């Protein structure tokens, strides 16, 4: 007799990724693209992490709601995520805001972005819905969260981070009992409630929710009928369930995918220029906190066909070299020196230039003798010869987008305005 195989809950789930946000704190980086479409890690886009987590967890039905400046994001997903097959009971739906409910109504909130596509979700018949934010960097096996959701009998299970209590003021925070059932949900509290038994820490919402599909649809329809609702999961749906039903917290540490379990669970909201720069530069460490080399949990993406990176010239003061750096394919380091930098595809760094602490997006050209320190350079920028950034804070702030910590964002528009 053949033993019955265990059927993972993920096979009965649909992941729904909310990817319509701008990410305004990234300033000019999101002038032409939505935050989930922003480049990250030398090869991928931010959204690839949520999508890869779903795929690696065993989820084979995915929907992605888009809205703000979605062309770059949609094109990326069409190229890199087109391998789902209906004949294998797989689906990948890109769901731009398209006034499906009303001729005057776009997506009015995160909950509305799901509500307007109920007629697309229902025919697939998923037992569970995994609602995800498309703009965070982390690796997570959603199967563990699904299992806790079923075992606990919860109506919603919310992914949570354990963070120092006073750092939780910018999050939605869960007040839980000893069994992690949520007693109260507070949005950005001045005095966050601590965790039972660990009062110096609080449980902050990751914007990840698991529902039984039938229950979720009931909640969305009720919310849509409420004229006072803001149509948002964090502001409306979750507080209602916490007050009137059963909501449970799932601790991220229980499902975080990591190659070394002695290390802290890695999750980053790269929503500011400083955070974005730091998360990319972190990858240049000898052993980075985020393991992007783990073949058991790959980060899937659209990979261009490109030649390998090349380093040329070995003369005095003109040596193509890189130390503690990540360099993508099709880069040519022609007599330039790199340290603690991350370069995306197709970067050209010309002779005598020096990059230190640089995050360089695709197709950038760095002119001779340029000296660039602690910068983020947007896609396609041509850095003129001899440009110096990172030595004169006042001049940098006048020319570029400079943060309080000294990171400079450089775009082509800023370069075009230079009087050099």
Swiss-Prot record:
GO MF entries: ATP binding; glucose-1-phosphate adenylyltransferase activity
Membrane-spanning ranges: none
Keyword annotations of the record: ATP-binding, Carbohydrate metabolism, Glycogen biosynthesis, Glycogen metabolism, Nucleotide-binding, Nucleotidyltransferase, Transferase
Keyword Chloroplast in record: no
InterPro entries, per database record: ADP-Glc_PPase (IPR011831), ADP_Glu_pyroP_CS (IPR005836), GlgC_bac (IPR023049), GlmU/GlgC-like_hexapep (IPR056818), NTP_transferase_dom (IPR005835), Nucleotide-diphossugar_trans (IPR029044), Trimer_LpxA-like_sf (IPR011004)
Top-level taxon of origin: Bacteria
Pathway: Glycan biosynthesis; glycogen biosynthesis
GO biological process: glycogen biosynthetic process
EC number(s) on file: 2.7.7.27
PROSITE patterns in the record: ADP_GLC_PYROPHOSPH_1, ADP_GLC_PYROPHOSPH_2, ADP_GLC_PYROPHOSPH_3
Catalytic activity: alpha-D-glucose 1-phosphate + ATP + H(+) = ADP-alpha-D-glucose + diphosphate
Binding, alpha-D-glucose 1-phosphate: 107, 172, 187-188, 205
Coiled coil, from the record: none
HAMAP family named among the record's database cross-references: GlgC
PANTHER family associated with the record: GLUCOSE-1-PHOSPHATE ADENYLYLTRANSFERASE (PTHR43523:SF2), GLUCOSE-1-PHOSPHATE ADENYLYLTRANSFERASE-RELATED (PTHR43523)
The protein's assembly and partners: Homotetramer.
Function: Involved in the biosynthesis of ADP-glucose, a building block required for the elongation reactions to produce glycogen. Catalyzes the reaction between ATP and alpha-D-glucose 1-phosphate (G1P) to produce pyrophosphate and ADP-Glc.
Family listed: Belongs to the bacterial/plant glucose-1-phosphate adenylyltransferase family.
Entry protein name: Glucose-1-phosphate adenylyltransferase
The species this protein was found in: Rhizobium rhizogenes (strain K84 / ATCC BAA-868) (Agrobacterium radiobacter)
């Amino acid at each position: 007799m053949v033993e019955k195989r265990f059927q993972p809950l993920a096979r009965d789930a649909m992941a729904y990724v909310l990817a319509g946000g701008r990410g305004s704190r990234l300033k000019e980086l999101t002038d032409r693209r939505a935050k989930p479409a922003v480049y990250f890690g030398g090869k991928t886009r931010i959204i690839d992490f949520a999508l890869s987590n779903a795929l690696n967890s065993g989820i084979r039905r995915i929907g992605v709601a888009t809205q703000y400046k979605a062309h770059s994001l949609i094109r990326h997903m069409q190229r890199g995520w087109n391998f789902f097959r209906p004949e294998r009971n797989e689906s990948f739906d890109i769901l731009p805001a398209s006034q499906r409910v009303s001729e005057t109504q776009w997506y009015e909130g995160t909950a509305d972005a799901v509500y307007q596509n109920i007629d697309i979700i229902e025919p697939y018949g998923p037992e569970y819905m995994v609602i995800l934010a498309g703009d965070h960097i982390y690796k997570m096996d959603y199967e563990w969260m699904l299992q806790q959701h079923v075992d606990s009998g919860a109506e919603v299970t919310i992914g949570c981070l354990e963070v120092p209590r006073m750092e939780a003021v910018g999050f939605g925070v869960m007040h839980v009992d000893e069994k992690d059932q949520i007693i109260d949900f507070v949005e950005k509290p001045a005095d966050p409630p601590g965790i039972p038994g660990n009062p110096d820490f609080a449980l902050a919402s990751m914007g990840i929710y698991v529902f039984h599909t039938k229950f979720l649809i009931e909640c969305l329809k009720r919310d849509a009928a409420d004229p006072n609702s803001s149509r948002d999961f964090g502001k409306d749906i979750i507080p209602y369930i916490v007050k009137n039903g059963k909501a449970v917290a799932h601790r991220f540490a229980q499902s975080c995918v990591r190659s070394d379990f002695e290390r802290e669970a890695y999750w980053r909201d790269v929503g500011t220029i400083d955070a974005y720069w730091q998360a990319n530069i972190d990858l240049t460490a000898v052993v980075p906190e985020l393991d992007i080399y783990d073949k058991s949990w790959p980060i899937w993406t659209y990979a261009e066909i490109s030649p390998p990176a090349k380093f040329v010239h070995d003369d005095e003061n003109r040596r193509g070299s890189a130390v503690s750096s990540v360099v993508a394919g099709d880069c040519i380091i022609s007599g330039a020196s790199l340290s603690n930098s991350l370069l995306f595809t197709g970067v050209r760094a010309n002779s005598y230039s020096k990059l230190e602490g640089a995050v360089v997006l695709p197709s950038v050209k760095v002119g001779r003798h340029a000296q660039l320190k602690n910068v983020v350079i947007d896609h396609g920028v041509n850095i003129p010869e001899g440009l110096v950034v990172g030595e004169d804070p006042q001049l940098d702030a006048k020319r570029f987008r400079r943060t309080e910590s000294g990171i400079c964002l450089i775009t082509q528009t800023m370069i075009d305005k230079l009087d050099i």
